[in-house]
């Protein structure tokens, strides 16, 4: 199944800039959900934006960060923190991009969100 989401890693930037990046990404017709992330202190800050009613940003943030940090927010806009050490302990040598993508795909599959597929979006190291 193709996925209609985008994941982008940003060089060190402020949380508000991550939100702006996410807002830009969901302006693309084929992208219903965006996850932007950056290094922050002892881990990574993530920002999630959604324009699809079945893809609640707050629930996705909590799901992605479960066991490695914490996340939450609102239905369309949310954020979270992934602690580097906890991520390494739980996921071994996987990069933050790989962890976010894996957890996001699992969330979509576990929640049977499939009727939205058509065009996939993936952007790594885009900003």
Where are these regions (language model features)?
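Hydrophobic helix-and-loop "lid/oligomerization" segment in the mid-to-C-terminal part
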Residues: 1-127
